């Protein structure tokens, strides 16, 4: 299995946020320092794109890296601009079933080290479609009879 990684897509969003921040700084410098006599409608042009980013605040991007490991796969996730990383080992011995979630996540019921069932959500909304299908296929290979609970 090829590694599943969405680093490129999330990095494009990160640099778009950086560019937008520089755009806002430039508009404020231009309006208040270079040409204070310009109309205030220019400030509206600086803040209009923020409404395009509103959906991304709700659906904040995460880095997802899934690699094949012995008898299963290792899934690492990390939020954008965060240092904390979460790892999840999915094997045929601990993967019990799926549970129903929204269209942004895959819900997995996994056994922990004390043999207690835990629910884990994997955010897949920032994956490309072919990577999402590869992840689902690998989960199907690990446990082809996993029911939806």
Regions inferred by a protein language model and the residue ranges of each:
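N-terminal membrane-targeting/pre-transmembrane regions
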Residues: 1-36
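Short, exposed beta-strand/loop patches in secreted or surface proteins that constitute
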Residues: 64-68, 96-99, 110-112
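Short hydrophobic/aromatic-rich beta-strand segments that constitute the beta-sheet cores
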Residues: 73-77, 97, 107
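Alpha-helical transmembrane segments
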Residues: 23-27, 48-53
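Conserved beta-hairpin
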Residues: 51-89
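Phosphoinositide-dependent membrane-docking surfaces
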Residues: 85-104
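Hydrophobic alpha-helical transmembrane segments
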Residues: 32-48
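A membrane-cytosol interface segment of integral membrane proteins
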Residues: 108-149
